[in-house]
Amino acid sequence: MITANLVLKTSKSTPLNWRDLIACTEEELSGFDIAALNLACAAGLPGTSQLDIQSCLRTLDSWAKEIAKATKRCQWFRQNPQKYNGSFNLFRVHVMSSVLRVRFGFRYKPEMIHYDENKETFFRAEELFIHGLIEGKGGCCSSMPILFVAVGRRLGYPLKLVRAYSHYFVRWDSPKERFNIEVSNSDGFNNYTDDHYRSWPEPISPEQERDYCLLSSLSPSRELASFLFERASVWHCVADYRQAVDALIWASVLEPDNLFYNSMIFPELDKWNNYLRILMPRLQPEIRYNLPPQRRYPADKVSAAVEKEIIGLQVVQGLLAAPEGQEMWQLRVREIR
């Protein structure tokens, strides 16, 4: 459907399981809706039992249709092209931003405006993933740019997701034109330069920009890795370190050159280990276990030592959680005494 030079695309079906998605090639991932990838990584998190992914995707389809109609009707560009630096594409993005905010409640969640990254914060799935925005609850810089990209791509816009320091923004990225789009603010729309994000929200060094893969347009596999990191953040907040570590490792597998993900794995393993130690009895029997013959993670991306530590912690957690494990644990402690 062509409407005012807009190519309207509706969502494609997708394997709505992130474990299926991590096995896909880059080319295969590029065929999936970014919204579906994001929601697949949200599925199964605390607070998502009522999440209807297909309903969310249909809502985004309907929003895109309304934006296409509004863009066709709008005469702002003809009346004042200088306001948009003579760029019809910048005008189209402005219209999309306005319709999302005014018509569909696209906004930053008030409770998250004063987020302090130096303090422990409890993140909910609805805040870090796009279903919270679709449901009208608001979002943050972890969800607003993703939804913006998802709707824009339905309109045929060449939008990319970009990472800054603890922040995401959007980029119009085509061979003919390139500009940034800041959508996670309360006053509407801005298009800052890359240099702006080198000093905001926090200054970044050239080494951080390189090692953390910042300010580059993300490929589909990097997008998926980002969503798995957000998944890990939610599991971390509810102290399910087993799930958090698993999501972090798969994020690092998808994006091995991003040293930030790798740097987060060992602290999370330490938190998991310390958490289990609190639950253990004072007298601890020796635990022996055999490693499975087949590796859980790609051997060229995750060391055998890390995988062994994960399996060991998982065994201990299983013994502590299962009634039969607790009974066996207590029996062995009595034998040691």
Question: PLM features: what roles do these ranges have?
Answer:
Residues 1-337:
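A structural boundary/capping signal
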